[in-house]
Structures are given as structure tokens and as C-alpha cells.
Amino acid sequence: MKEYLVPTGDGEAQFIERRSRFIGHIFLTETEEEALARLKQMREQYWDATHNVYAYIIRDGATRFSDDGEPGGTAGMPVLQVLQREELYNVTCVVTRYFGGILLGAGGLVRAYAHGAK
């Protein structure tokens, strides 16, 4: 039987990057329905955010991510890559951004969203 890592509970962390506020959340989610419910909850809680980027990996094979309006490949994929690199399963990560008025550029977005997932 193959072993795999799962989060032991929910987590939250915040940081500021060039005046943009990032809030990272991680959740244990055992089904795709649970992952989508958590995403809905975050979108309702942070309804006024500029972006709610997410990625999830469910052990049964469901893997999804979204840039939520950020330039393609600069937000959801870096979040997913952090989860994959850490070999996590049954996990949903949502990184919320409140735009601070300064454009971060593609590289800055990748670094910021990856940091939010860590």
C-alpha cells in the first residue's frame, strides 16, 4: 500500500508583497465536492478580493487549478506545483489577493502565489 501525506488540519497565513495582500488557506478535503465547497466558502468570505486562486489534489485522481483572472500560468499552476512538490493529497489550497496598486509582473506573481501556498 502506497503512503501519502495529507494536511492534519486547516491553516492560514498572510503576507504583503508590494502593497498587495495575500492570504493563503489550506484544507483537508477528501472529495472533489469538499474541495469545491471550500472554494465556494472562500469566495463568499473574500467576496471583495481581486482574485481567489486555487488548486486541489484529491487522492482519487481529481486535480484542478485556476488562475482566477491572473495571467495564464502565473497563479494556479504555481500553487498546484507547491502541493505536488510537497507530495500532498486530499488537499485544497486557496490563495486570495487584494491588489495593492503595483503590478508584480509574471515572475512576481509566480513567486507570490507559490509563497502563499507554502
Regions of interest found by a model, annotated:
Residues 1-73:
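C-terminal regulatory domains involved in ligand/effector binding and gene-expression control
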Residues 43, 83-88, 114, 118:
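Signal for well-folded cores of large energy- and translation-related assemblies
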Residues 49-53, 79-82, 117-118:
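Glycine-rich loops and low-complexity Gly/Arg-rich segments
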Residues 68-102:
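Conserved interaction-surface patches within small, structured recognition/assembly domains
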Residues 92-96, 102-118:
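Glycine- and Gly-Pro-enriched alpha-helical subdomains that act as flexible
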